[in-house]
């Protein structure tokens, strides 16, 4: 055994052993408890970042710990390989996205392997390979035939730079999340998943997810957005509009119906188009509205604008004529693209009415009173008692809801209705590097799904896109085909699927990744699913996690899986953050400098007071800690850390820096501290092993000092078992091991019994660290005399008897101040403890001349004497 800790050698040997033994390849073992641990698979961007290291280390620690509990553990890995970055890189480097992607996968796989992850690489999936997306296309055709997928024209967010449609969530402040381009609204034919058909179940089954963070469940509840309200119809006729009909609106506040003073419609609404026919000003305004974002968040914050149409509708209960306005804050895809405006009790309507001098009529008595003067107050939106509402005066919200419904039903102008904020999922993307949509367009037969025996529709991999829309639409060799129904010439669909589709079912494919008879092999899926522990960032709370839950229910209804939910437990790991440093240039731009290129000056208390660039010695500004990102140049290359310190040091630091659900702040000194700790473990083990391994520990003959050491060993086991097994608090488990190391380093090694006790301590340290620092643990376990590898060892078992103390040291306080301590038998009664405290020499000095009023005994901890 080397005298010095040599991580490179140790880690290479451990990884070679695991590879040769196929240590992490698993198969179904009926009767053995399974555990499926999965971290969200990476996009093959080119190289790992510290966020990856943290994510995959957390999953690996959990996987290895569960294996030590005797479970059959599956931890797979794969690649979320389709997407725009590959196309962008391809254009920049004039290389096909496939080549760029596969090269990145090869490099990143070698990086992941160097971390020593307990991954079953035999189950690796790559979503851009036909053997994967074939089954996605197969499911698409099944769902299309059932009507769960359908095609319709939709108003979409069009990114003019990326030449593709973006989901609402991909539009940030009116701009594309990737390109930064101003988004336009367009009407184009698209394919949609009917996720709204599952809205109720997606909402209700959140209650089953007891292992999910409440924050994530709340975000999903809000996104699904179930609301009970009323559909109200405002009649119009030939005199007022030129045709007869009703304007439908949905409102969650029917109690305020008598306060409606105008109605507002979306730019795409039929009445807007009707009014704009001979109105150039309105035509221009509608065009402006259509150029804006269709994301609700953007609509909520933008300036409210509108134009009157000159059209009028009737109030359904009073017959009063209400003007129709086109307003930019009304969305066509929410409700019916129209709102009844009640300025007195809705903030948007209030703002709009005051801007355009429209009437404001208060109809609810709120905590602010009976009138609602500007500026807006939150109280105006409260529920309350109805006023100025005729026959409905005096009713509360619930009473008004029911009474309004009765009145509207009588006139056949309304009824209660449940509505969801959730929209159907548009998955068509006008880009190349994605899964082809398996539909053939035939003039005679319409949209025809590609037959199963013609799947997969293979994406040509030798294409270099140029950024002008999808190259597939310019490739007759791809889109020209014959109709499977009638045999006539037809055209293949050239749109590809949203890449969120691939990541919505990959976890299920891992159960049987090589199965050629279907999307999953049912027996394997039932054996492994649902995933026991899923790990990933909270930024995926809505999109990915909601889509995966939806897909699981689709697969269940197709008979592919048996469970209702894909992930039993969810851990949302925090970000890795680091200091930022910058200079503001003369033109106002920021230049960011990597922490490795900056030298810090500290005061006497080690607080950073200034920073300078090493290259030129000139000052730089300290920008505070932010998420590691290319944009702030504050990332640390994991590979350089692994090369310098070893994977175990990186893993240890990442798990010690903070609890997994909190942000972890990168610290060079913290990494060095983790490395020093592993060197201490190695040094103690090396010294112990060099003397020869001791015989068996005789627990019955331990002296008092040895009992204290053994108590520390089992206290560490108890605390670490709780922290790792129940709370995923790896940082406190590591702290417990460090405390134990302090005890072991000071322990006597004079006798065989002393050395046997240190042996138990070192074995415990090795086992407790095994999930976190597996390489050094692999080596130490072998050197400590074990023939079987540490990956096959069990988690250490707590000996409760070792925690029993014969005597306790109790603190004595007089009037809350420390005045002494006493050693008492652990079984001492309260009376015996109090008597000993009163008799303590130092205590007698401090209560001299005082009357003892009360004695408080906290068992096993302290005695407080209250005297005056």
Curated annotation (Swiss-Prot):
Chief location of this protein? cytoplasm
Record keyword Flavoprotein present? no
Q: Which key words tag this protein in UniProt?
A: Aminoacyl-tRNA synthetase, ATP-binding, Cytoplasm, Ligase, Nucleotide-binding, Protein biosynthesis
Q: A single GO BP annotation from the record?
A: leucyl-tRNA aminoacylation
Superkingdom, natural source: Bacteria
Residues recorded as binding ATP, renumbered to this chain, are 630
Question: Which pairs are disulfide-linked?
Answer: none
**Molecular function as annotated in GO:** aminoacyl-tRNA deacylase activity; ATP binding; leucine-tRNA ligase activity
Gene source species: Pseudomonas fluorescens (strain Pf0-1)
Please indicate the residue ranges that the annotation assigns to the motif 'KMSKS' region. 627-631
Family recorded in the similarity comment: Belongs to the class-I aminoacyl-tRNA synthetase family.
Q: Does the keyword Amino-acid biosynthesis apply?
A: no
Q: Gene3D superfamilies per the record?
A: 2.20.28.290, 3.10.20.590, HUPs (3.40.50.620), Isoleucyl-tRNA Synthetase, Domain 1 (1.10.730.10), Valyl/Leucyl/Isoleucyl-tRNA synthetase, editing domain (3.90.740.10)
Class of enzymatic activity (EC top level): ligase
Supply the gene name.
leuS
Reactions listed under catalytic activity: tRNA(Leu) + L-leucine + ATP = L-leucyl-tRNA(Leu) + AMP + diphosphate
Q: From the record, which residues define motif 'HIGH' region?
A: 42-52
Query: Which PROSITE patterns does the entry link to?
Result: AA_TRNA_LIGASE_I
Q: Which GO terms describe its cellular component?
A: cytosol
Q: What is its EC number?
A: 6.1.1.4
NCBIfam families hit by this protein: leuS_bact
Q: What is this protein called?
A: Leucine--tRNA ligase
Q: Where in the cell is it found?
A: Cytoplasm
